[in-house]
Amino acid sequence: KYTSQLVTYGQEVRKAFDTLTSNVSRPVSINFFSLYVNEAALLHQIENAIEKAKSYELFMAIMLGRNDEEMNELKTIASHASNDERFTNVVFMVFDATFGDDNYERFIEYMANAQCASRHNLADQRAAHDKNAQAMISDWMKEVRRSNFSVYVKGESETFSTMKLATAVNVGIAPKVFSRGAETLDLLRTRAPKTFWKNQQAKETAKNILMFNTYDEIIGKATGPALPLKFLFQDAVDDNLHWKENVDKENHPLYLVSEFVSRKIKNADKAKEFNLAEKFIELTRAPYGLFPSYAGIAMLSFAMRPWINKIYSVDGKPRLAQHLVDDVMETFKSWENGKPSNKITFTFETKEAGQLSKLLIKVFKLKSLKTYSDISSLKDARWAISHEYTAEKGY
């Protein structure tokens, strides 16, 4: 019999930790663990839970012990595991408040009595025993809130008051895991309200960043919950949205996300099609951790600005700013759903192809065709010549 019986009995433990983490800015994946058959089996449980969490969530392994012996063993396991590359982005939390062996025996007795009453259709007695068991867990959670917990992440450990769990996560723990995430900016983290970090499809933010061309225009449109976006941009770009000379190229998330996107596009095979969600999927993982929110959508939108008119839909049309707004939103949708989207599969046009396209437009006067004059790529030009131009000339 394992302490996990306590954690999974009813909703008391889940409710307690939902409350403790309610002010954590980043989405979290809360998972409860206790001593199991052996250390390897416990770590395997954690590995399985990681696979079910979203890559941008802060994975919290909440470890609770029945007694001090269990608690200390959990600390040893957490300390070792935090140095294991399999758990490099896992936040292990071991709580000092234990349930107690005597309480555990009473709890088991309540559970057994509840099951016995249930088998004999004694609903009132079953409910009474169940209520007593739940009350014991509720009291334990009160002790947990009043005590301390130890955090183990990336081979380092710290101790905090449980009442300050959310602050500890926001200030020191989440930025350690998502070191290229928006929460690494002190001003943004301390001044942005919870609504700023809310998981949402902030399309208006994508539109403003891709459609306007000055800092004042973009920030002027960032009102209400989006207002803190100014803290994301103010130390990174000038009035014309160019990088400031003193931008922190090692740490500023806006710069790092933009560099990632630029590197991926520049190094892509220009002869092959290019899917934004697939090519940029690493942005959803640590150390970036982009998710659909004001900050996440703003960073990807800004990173796509240099590629306006430079990537093409599969029919040969260039993606203008208004198109990229939809493309950014579709990319986040694809990530969130975990499903590929053909809507964001694009191609490139080489320098030579662009020059040939312009030459064909000039030689054959393709812009003056009556029925098809919106020509913006070599593919367009070829189609116009073989269909519209030849038809008009009577070939």
What do these predicted regions represent?
Residues 1-395:
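Extended alpha-helical scaffold and adjacent linker segments that couple domains
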